[in-house]
Amino acid sequence: MIKWPWKVQESAHQTALPWQEALSIPLLTCLTEQEQSKLVALAERFLQQKRLVPLQGFELNSLRSCRIALLFCLPVLELGLEWLDGFHEVLIYPAPFVVDDEWEDDIGLVHNQRIVQSGQSWQQGPIVLNWLDIQDSFDASGFNLIIHEVAHKLDTRNGDRASGVPFISLREVAGWEHDLHAAMNNIQEEIELVGENAASIDAYAASDPAECFAVLSEYFFSAPELFAPRFPSLWQRFCQFYQQDPLQRLHHANDTDSFSATNVH
C-alpha cells in the first residue's frame, strides 16, 4: 500500500484536499511515487502562496484547485517554487475570454481589436486562464494551457521581456538560440508544406521565439515522444533547464505497465 505523505495529516484537517484524486489525470500518471509526493508538496505551498480567483460564475472547488496547482508546479518540480514568484494571482474564466488588443504597425499607426484569448501571462501581474482549456490540459496531447503560461513566466525571469531564452548560464545562450530558431524554421517549413491544421507541432510555435519556447514546453511535458526525436539537441537543452526527462519517465512507466501485465495471474 502506498503511504502518501499528505494523507498522514488528513485526520487533523476537517477538509483534507483530494490530492490522490487530483493526481489521477493522464498527464501525471507517469510520475513515480516519489515525484508525485514532491509535486503535491509544491502544490500545497502554491495554494498557500497564490490566490485563485474564479470569474464570470466559474465554480472553483477543492479538486479543481488541486489540479490547477499540480499543473503549475510540474514545470518547476526540480527548479523550485521560487521560480513562480513573479505573480500572486491566477484569474480563471469558465471559457475563452475576449480582450482588447492594441498594437502599432510598421508606420506607427495604433490599432485596436477585440480578440478571443485562452490565457494571458502579464509580466508584472496575474496569470489569466480559462477552465475549458485547463480541462483539455489534463491529457498527454501536446496541449497544456497552464504549462504554456508558466513557460512565459519562466522566460521573463531572464530579463524585462519574454525572449524564448529562460534563465540559463550565459555560455549556453547562443546554443539555445541557435537550436530554438532552427526548430522554428523547421516548424514553419512543415506549415508551408502541409498547412497549419495538419502540422504535427502547434503552428503558434513558429510565430516568435517566446511562443516557440512556451509551445515546446507544452510538448516537452505532455508529448515528449513528438518533441525529442524531432529536435534532439533542443530536447537536451530543455532537459537540462527543467532538470527533468519526461521521455525517460514515459518509457519507464510503459516498461512498468508491461511488466505488471505479464505478471498478472
From Swiss-Prot:
<dbReference type="Pfam" id="PF06167">
    <property type="entry name" value="Peptidase_M90"/>
</dbReference>
<keyword id="KW-0645">Protease</keyword>
<keyword id="KW-0378">Hydrolase</keyword>
<keyword id="KW-0031">Aminopeptidase</keyword>
<feature type="binding site">
    <location>
        <position position="211"/>
    </location>
    <ligand>
        <name>Zn(2+)</name>
    </ligand>
</feature>
<dbReference type="GO" id="GO:0008237">
    <property type="term" value="F:metallopeptidase activity"/>
</dbReference>
<keyword id="KW-0482">Metalloprotease</keyword>
<comment type="subunit">
    <text>Interacts with Mlc.</text>
</comment>
<keyword id="KW-0862">Zinc</keyword>
<feature type="binding site">
    <location>
        <position position="148"/>
    </location>
    <ligand>
        <name>Zn(2+)</name>
    </ligand>
</feature>
<feature type="binding site">
    <location>
        <position position="111"/>
    </location>
    <ligand>
        <name>Zn(2+)</name>
    </ligand>
</feature>
<dbReference type="InterPro" id="IPR057256">
    <property type="entry name" value="MtfA_enterob"/>
</dbReference>
<dbReference type="InterPro" id="IPR010384">
    <property type="entry name" value="MtfA_fam"/>
</dbReference>
<comment type="similarity">
    <text>Belongs to the MtfA family.</text>
</comment>
<dbReference type="GO" id="GO:0005829">
    <property type="term" value="C:cytosol"/>
</dbReference>
<dbReference type="GO" id="GO:0006508">
    <property type="term" value="P:proteolysis"/>
</dbReference>
<dbReference type="InterPro" id="IPR042252">
    <property type="entry name" value="MtfA_N"/>
</dbReference>
<keyword id="KW-0963">Cytoplasm</keyword>
<comment type="function">
    <text>Involved in the modulation of the activity of the glucose-phosphotransferase system (glucose-PTS). Interacts with the transcriptional repressor Mlc, preventing its interaction with DNA and leading to the modulation of expression of genes regulated by Mlc, including ptsG, which encodes the PTS system glucose-specific EIICB component.</text>
</comment>
<dbReference type="GO" id="GO:0004177">
    <property type="term" value="F:aminopeptidase activity"/>
</dbReference>
<feature type="binding site">
    <location>
        <position position="152"/>
    </location>
    <ligand>
        <name>Zn(2+)</name>
    </ligand>
</feature>
<dbReference type="InterPro" id="IPR024079">
    <property type="entry name" value="MetalloPept_cat_dom_sf"/>
</dbReference>
<protein>
    <recommendedName>
        <fullName>Mlc titration factor A</fullName>
        <ecNumber>3.4.11.-</ecNumber>
    </recommendedName>
</protein>
<keyword id="KW-0479">Metal-binding</keyword>
<dbReference type="GO" id="GO:0008270">
    <property type="term" value="F:zinc ion binding"/>
</dbReference>
<comment type="function">
    <text>Shows zinc-dependent metallopeptidase activity.</text>
</comment>
